[in-house]
Amino acid sequence: MPRSQRNDNFIDKTFTLVADTSLQVIPTTQGEKKAFTYYRDGMSAQSEGEYAEASQNYYEAMRLEIDPYDRSYILHNIGLIHTSNGEHARALEYYFQALERNPSLPQAFNNMAVICHYRGEQAIQQGDFETSEAWFGKAADHWKQAVLLAPGNYIEAQNWLKITGRLKD
């Protein structure tokens, strides 16, 4: 039984009902419908911290989904799981793959910037200021892209860019 049919949360049930109804009305193939079901179940598992189950669902969705735009969101969510698990290098790979398919995904740029900023902070703690500047530079580049795509979002990133003098580059 799909996860979405096991959920007791009212909001999730409502979303599932609306999504299922939309899938019946909008012309889609069986593969696309199945991919969406796996994606939806992956999101549900991920929101509950069930990362292994979420990953399995996302990989199944990737196997079935052919649309690059839809695949970008699946890849982004896989990146989120790797970020949550502290696997930053793998997370960055998935965010890059998501952006290859959808260059207008500000949350992927933001998440890459957060990882780069974190690595810059780690380098400072290790006394490696040259490496920290390189990581902070990458963070700035990614945050600039995120802010460009979603100007009203990422206020903290905008403030960091201003405070550190990186906004004008």
UniProtKB/Swiss-Prot annotation:
Cited InterPro entries: PSI_Ycf3_assembly (IPR022818), TPR-like_helical_dom_sf (IPR011990), TPR_rpt (IPR019734)
One BP term from GO: photosynthesis
Residues spanning the membrane: none
Intervals holding TPR repeats: 35-68, 72-105, 120-153
Principal localisation: plastid
Claim: Repeat is one of the keywords in the record: yes
Keyword annotations of the record: Chloroplast, Membrane, Photosynthesis, Plastid, Repeat, Thylakoid, TPR repeat
Function, in words: Essential for the assembly of the photosystem I (PSI) complex. May act as a chaperone-like factor to guide the assembly of the PSI subunits.
Protein family per UniProt: Belongs to the Ycf3 family.
Protein name: Photosystem I assembly protein Ycf3
The species this protein was found in: Huperzia lucidula (Shining clubmoss)
Gene field: ycf3
